[in-house]
Amino acid sequence: MTTLADLRINYSRASLDEADAAPDPFAQFDRWFNEALAAKLPEPNTMTLATVGADGRPSARIVLVKGVDERGFVFFTNYESRKGRDLAAHPYAALLFYWIELERQVRIEGRVEKTSAEESDRYFASRPVGSRIGAWASEQSTVIDSRATLEAREKAFSERYGDDPPRPPHWGGYRVVPDTLEFWQGRPSRLHDRLVYTRDAAAPHGWTISRLSP
């Protein structure tokens, strides 16, 4: 039987060099994300979101990034969920994109702010009706007694709002505004390439690029 200690692969698909890296991290992310799309990876917009609660306990979960530009990385959720409560207490987060098929990771850290109501409304209106009803039906992260309770709430809100449910006041977007972004490319013998962009107003393009030891 294979033991956990024996599970390993040697990464050799690509390299990451300072000379080839984009001058700003958003352009570099766009480049890698488009390569993930071209490789037809399943849901390349999935990312791990890590937060810390008022009690100092960390928490992580998978969410979907729904917008990326020079301002940051946007996701949407229930503001009253555990992640929402964490961010209310400590408005900082870490993100991780992991594209194992390309032997790549992108790590992002920064402060978090809510998106505007207009931006949240616009995205909410683009969602399927069932997902919009679900945002009303689910009191996210609270204990319920059964699946039947959730389905009853879904039915009640569907009857109430029909095909045009409005955005709940407790549901909307967050933007992670990065101060550091690390691009990790797997390499042979665990001597991986790691380039980190650090926000620096005095630097060209507003970012410095450094190589980290693997």
Curated annotation (Swiss-Prot):
Substrate binds at R8, I9, N10, Y11, K66, Y123, R127, S131, R190, L191, H192. InterPro entries: Pyridox_Oxase (IPR000659), Pyridox_Oxase_CS (IPR019740), Pyridox_Oxase_N (IPR011576), Pyridoxamine_oxidase_dimer_C (IPR019576), Split_barrel_FMN-bd (IPR012349). Its EC number is 1.4.3.5. FMN binds at residues 61-66, 76-77, 82-83, 105, 140-141, 184, 194. It comes from the Bacteria. It is an enzyme of class 1 (oxidoreductase). Pathway: Cofactor metabolism; pyridoxal 5'-phosphate salvage; pyridoxal 5'-phosphate from pyridoxamine 5'-phosphate: step 1/1; Cofactor metabolism; pyridoxal 5'-phosphate salvage; pyridoxal 5'-phosphate from pyridoxine 5'-phosphate: step 1/1. GO terms for biological process: pyridoxine biosynthetic process. Transmembrane segments: none annotated. PANTHER family: PYRIDOXINE-5'-PHOSPHATE OXIDASE (PTHR10851:SF0), PYRIDOXINE-5-PHOSPHATE OXIDASE (PTHR10851). NCBIfam families: pdxH, PRK05679.1. This is Pyridoxine/pyridoxamine 5'-phosphate oxidase. It comes from Burkholderia multivorans (strain ATCC 17616 / 249).
